[in-house]
Design a protein with these regions (language model features):
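Short capping motifs at secondary-structure boundaries
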Residues: 49, 54, 129-141, 169-175
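Short, structured beta-strand segments at or near domain termini in extracellular proteins/domains
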Residues: 306-317
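N-terminal export leaders
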Residues: 7-8
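A short glycine-rich, aromatic-capped structural motif
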Residues: 77-138, 158-160, 245, 317
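N-terminal pre-domain segments of enzymes
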Residues: 26-76
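Short, P/G- and charge-enriched loop/turn segments at secondary-structure junctions
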Residues: 72-76, 103-107, 216, 297-302
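Boundary at the C-terminal end of the N-terminal hydrophobic targeting segment
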Residues: 20-24
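Functional-site microenvironments in short loops/helix caps that host divalent-cation chemistry
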Residues: 94, 98-99, 145-151, 157-298, ...
Length: 317
């Protein structure tokens, strides 16, 4: 992933952004819950005589967990080898960093109007290799840098590779998998917090995989200099692991130097035709803690490969 020091070079290569039309307003979560409750009550009333007639062993199984989205957070998988997904609730948050941080991350309010699902872990080599085995992902087998494959996050992925994976998974499952938007990613990473990290104001190498030796946040021996198996570090309040560090995670958005009045406030991706660069979030094993902040952003060309770049995925509900 290209770091902030080279983003100015990226910016001058991009086509001038087209004015984005505001998306259609999404229904409020409260209205959606009310509608689901009403429909459920009607269905139960209609089927009550039949249900009462069944003996206990014959009673219908509980509905799939994903049907219970309004009731709370839920994990699910669409197939045995599919990524484990976590339902993220709707809500509002302040995206970006305060002026005191002196970063190109201007704060603004964003509304996530409907729940969506995010992979609990970064996509692993096992999951990527399953895509290749099933004639997907362009047959591309990325290098693992000698660190091993298995449950380590897949790296050496371009943004285009990341799009290939979600396209394949969507066809395989018939479900709407995609990359997260920048806003969705930060909302999921923060998990209700307003501090630089979901842990608080600082982060140490026992909490995430990054280069703690570069800024004094940890002893040099804890600079692991490679990825770690996913789930090696604690999950945030939404149940997501490795939102800070391990591998940069490609999102859908085109790269923009900073948020402006054109930046979406509804959680959608900020895209335009012809953009060559895209955004990465989360930082990686080789970055200092400043690059791991929930608001930190980086960018890269859509066909760029790096041992720091991987992905996390989203799914519509």
């Amino acid at each position: 992933m290209i770091t902030r020091r080279t983003l100015a070079l990226l910016a001058v290569t991009f086509l001038a952004p087209a004015a984005a039309e505001a998306g259609a307003a999404k229904p409020k979560l409260e209205a959606r819950i009310g509608e689901l409750k009403a429909k459920t009550a009607a269905l139960v009333a209609a089927q009550r005589p039949h249900l009462d007639a069944l003996s206990p062993p014959q009673r219908l199984a509980a509905p799939p967990a994903i049907w219970r989205v309004p009731g709370g957070l839920t994990d699910f998988k669409d197939c045995s080898r599919c990524p484990q997904m976590v339902v993220i609730p709707a809500g509002e948050f302040t995206m970006g960093s305060p002026p005191s941080d002196k970063q190109a991350e201007t704060q603004h309010r964003v509304t996530i109007a409907a729940p969506f699902a995010v992979s609990k872990f970064e996509i692993t080599f096992d999951q990527w290799d399953d895509c290749v085995k099933n004639r997907g992902c362009g047959g591309y087998r990325p290098e693992d840098e000698g660190w091993g494959r298995g449950k380590r996050p897949v790296v050496n992925l371009s943004w285009e590779n990341a799009r290939d994976y979600v396209s394949w998974l969507s066809v395989k499952t018939g479900k709407p998998y995609r990359l997260l938007s920048e806003a969705e990613w930060e909302y999921a990473a923060r998990a209700g917090t307003t501090t630089p990290f979901w842990f608080g104001a600082t982060i140490v190498p026992s909490q995430a995989n990054f280069d703690g030796s570069t800024d004094g946040s940890g002893p040099s021996e804890l600079n692991r200099q490679k990825t770690m198996p996913v789930g090696s570090f604690p999950a945030n309040a939404f149940g997501l692991h490795d939102m800070h560090g391990n591998a940069w995670e490609w999102v859908e958005d085109c790269w923009h130097d900073d948020y402006t009045a054109k930046a979406p406030t509804d959680g959608s991706a900020w895209v335009e035709d012809g953009c060559r660069g895209h955004v990465g979030r989360g930082g990686s094993w080789e970055d200092s803690q400043s690059e791991l902040r929930s608001s930190a952003r980086s960018g890269g060309f859509k066909d760029e490969l790096s041992s720091t770049d991987g992905l996390r995925i989203a799914r519509g509900l």
